[in-house]
């Protein structure tokens, strides 16, 4: 394995990423642009059939280092993603949305024999957004954030109606933050801070501290802010990214031949990094070679 420090904060490794993950800091972003199973380059699988087995050891390693702030951007074909999706779910990755890279008609103009293929010309790839679901230890088991909030409040001995008093609302806390139904969503950090303060002031003395993950001190507002992924929504951008395939100096070539047919435009790479991280965050690109 060779490591080259390109510039401050940017490190290039020449080696098998499976042997390198343990050396890397925890990621805020993972940009995974690995095999598609289309026999597109040396080492690629010939078909998508074996993609789940190929990706699983990588997904297992990503999951060891990922935090609730981590966003995974998984590039592939539609069928390749469909095959790998169950493995991502198995390791606790939550699907957010499927983004489509539309390369436009120029990508296939004059180069598609639809009579032989019997399907429409393909001008797309997908970049699927996943986040690592937050989980909490509860009596030796892992529980979701939704369940953990209810379990912790139940320990206080107070009725759930008191969560509204804690948040200074009429019924929003019981209706949104402590509901069992699909309408639940994560309380904002300022509301969580109020809930924690109220629980530890009025809850049963023998159960304190409440809403603690170390058993010694309650979680703070800052702690809670680290329990969700970063997302900076750019104005006017949807989940369909219409950008032509590279044909300019940005395309990496060996002689006259492209080194990689599916090289991504820097515009799209920059977009996903900027959407899901801040300055000085850690970005993994495990298949950058």
Model-derived segments and spans:
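Core catalytic lobe of class I
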Residues: 3-288
């Amino acid at each position: 394995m060779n490591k080259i420090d390109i510039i401050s904060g940017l490190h290039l490794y020449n080696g098998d990423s499976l042997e390198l993950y343990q050396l890397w800091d925890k990621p805020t972003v993972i940009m995974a642009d690995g095999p598609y199973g289309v026999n597109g380059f040396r080492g690629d699988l010939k078909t998508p059939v074996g993609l789940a087995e190929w990706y699983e050891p990588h997904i297992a390693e990503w999951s060891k280092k990922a935090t609730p702030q981590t966003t995974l951007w998984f590039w592939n074909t539609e069928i390749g993603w469909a095959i790998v999706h169950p493995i991502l779910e198995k390791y606790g990755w939550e699907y957010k949305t499927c983004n489509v890279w539309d390369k436009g008609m120029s990508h296939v103009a004059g180069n598609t024999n639809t009579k032989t293929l019997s399907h429409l010309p393909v001008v797309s790839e997908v970049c699927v957004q996943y986040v690592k679901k937050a989980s909490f230890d509860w009596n030796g088991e892992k529980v979701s954030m939704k369940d953990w909030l209810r379990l912790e409040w139940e320990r206080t001995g107070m009725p759930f109606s008191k969560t509204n008093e804690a948040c200074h609302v009429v019924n929003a806390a019981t209706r949104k933050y402590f509901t069992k139904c699909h309408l639940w969503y994560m309380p904002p950090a300022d509301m969580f801070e109020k809930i924690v303060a109220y629980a530890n002031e009025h809850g049963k003395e023998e159960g304190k501290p409440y809403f603690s993950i170390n058993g010694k001190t309650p979680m703070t507002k800052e702690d809670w802010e680290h329990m969700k992924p970063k997302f900076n929504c750019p104005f006017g951008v949807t989940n369909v990214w219409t950008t032509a395939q590279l044909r300019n100096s940005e395309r990496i070539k060996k002689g006259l031949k492209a080194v990689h047919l599916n090289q991504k435009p820097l515009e799209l790479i920059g977009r996903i990094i900027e959407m899901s991280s801040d300055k000085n965050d850690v970005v993994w690109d495990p298949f950058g070679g």
